[in-house]
Amino acid sequence: MCVIDRSSTIQTRRLTLRAPANPDAARIGALAGDYAIAKMTTRMPWPYSQGDADGFVARCQVQDRRRDSTFVIELQDEGVVGVLGFFTPSDGHLEIGYWLGRPYWSRGLATEAVQGALAWAKSDWRKKLVVAGHFVDNPASGQVLIKAGFLYTGVVEPKASTARGETVATRMMVWLA
């Protein structure tokens, strides 16, 4: 496995994915302060404060890039619109997660970001398998993953949602290069 350079960027038709920097925290905080976003993630707290955003960016800057890599998603002429990350849980299978600010939903941006990130993971990180999941009450995320080439595994796992404070049924998916 290669070590991921902090300067790694992914370019797609409309997006640039790059490592979060300190100035991004204000925009992340503004977008992530929406319960509709937080409740569809496993890790995002609610309410989401500026301190949470600052801490998130600081943690991203010290990630073990042999196992994990987080990107802000920038839309041309609009700046940061969301976050995408790869992380390696204890089972060892690389997992992808993402979120977009509500003004950027239903524009194909999540699909474009995930597709670009998967191409990068395959070419730069030499990954041939990536897993993902979406809460059963978030079928739109499932559609993003299907469009990016993921398939349902048939497994539904309980996953904790920090924002909800409860476990949520999660449909698991896999992408094979």
Regions found by a protein language model. Name each.
Residues A32, T41, D64-R65:
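Hydrophobic residues in alpha-helical segments
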Residues A36-R59:
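Conserved GNAT-fold acetyl-CoA-binding loop/helix
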Residues N22, P47-Q50, R67:
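Generic alpha-helical scaffold signal
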Residues M1-Y35, V72-A177:
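Acyl-donor (CoA/ACP) binding surface of acyl/acetyltransferases
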Residues A58-V72:
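A short helix-loop-beta-strand connector motif used in the catalytic cores of GNAT acetyltransferases and
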